[in-house]
């Protein structure tokens, strides 16, 4: 049996934008997500520029209590996954609940 992969929805949280519309607009208009580091003081390291996610609000996706139990990179993956889910138009039903799965390209490096 051949396994198939189907991409049903898109979501993104990245230095170029925290949603698909913003990210795509910045990409096609040549706006970079690279700038001076602001999340911490980089004076102790040689690199002072990076691609940081900016203006991201996890409370749009989960409660503050849930957010405190997760690392920031989990916030980004969760938000992108939820965006992709909404974009797909899929509905969870009793019949399909065990068949639905979400992933991102970064999860392979985390396991």
Listing of model-derived features with the role each one plays in the protein:
Residues 101-111:
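Single conserved hydrophobic/aromatic residue that forms the stacking wall/gate
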Residues 1-103:
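Conserved "HGTGT" condensation-loop signature of ketosynthase/thiolase-family condensing enzymes
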């Amino acid at each position: 049996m051949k396994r198939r992969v189907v991409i049903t929805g898109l979501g993104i949280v990245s230095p170029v934008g925290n949603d698909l519309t913003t990210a795509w607009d910045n990409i096609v208009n040549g706006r970079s997500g690279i700038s001076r580091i602001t999340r911490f003081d980089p004076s102790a390291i040689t690199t002072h520029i990076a691609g940081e996610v900016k203006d991201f609000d996890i409370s749009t996706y989960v409660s503050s209590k849930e957010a405190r139990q997760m690392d920031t990179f989990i916030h980004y993956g969760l938000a992108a996954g939820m965006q992709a889910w909404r974009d797909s138009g899929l509905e969870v039903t009793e019949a399909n609940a065990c068949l639905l799965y979400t992933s991102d390209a970064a999860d392979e490096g985390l396991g």
